[in-house]
Amino acid sequence: MYEITITFTEVDHKGNDRTRKENLILEHAESFADAEQIGYDYGSGYTGIDVVSIKRSKLKEIVNEKPFNDETCKIYVAQIVDHFVDLETEETKDIKYSVALFAHDMNEAHKAIEQYIKQGLEDMDLVSIKESKYNGVLK
């Protein structure tokens, strides 16, 4: 997964040009060049499109799908710690990772991530959950 930031110019309701910035998650980009091309394709209907930032995402996965055409859904990022026992040393070790999910509010996000944690094979705990600045996910 990659994360990109694009800027473009759009016309507001008064007819003025306005520069807008969007942060997007790319789920299936193969390379930086592929991520850049997806960003330009996404913004092809706008003028002044520019991909200003590309980076590999720290997100492990996206745990649910956005409801079809539901623009009120926000993207939340949850940090999870996975506790496991190292079979060689028999010590408990922790791995922290982040996942993204769609929800309308914090309560719904918390319920969704709790269900995700219950599906885990190992002992997992929620560290934090917060509303992200991502505008969308491109597949």
Report residues per predicted region:
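Short N-terminal segments
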Residues: 1-4, 12-13, 50, 64
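Short, flexible N-terminal segments of the mature chain
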Residues: 17-34, 38, 99-108
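Short, well-structured hydrophobic secondary-structure segments
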Residues: 28-58
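A cross-kingdom feature marking solvent-exposed beta-strand/loop segments within repeated
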Residues: 10-26, 46, 91-99, 119-121, ...
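A short beta-strand micro-motif
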Residues: 1-9, 76-83
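Glycine-rich, aromatic-bearing surface loops/beta-hairpins
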Residues: 120-139
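Short, solvent-exposed interaction modules
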Residues: 46, 57-121
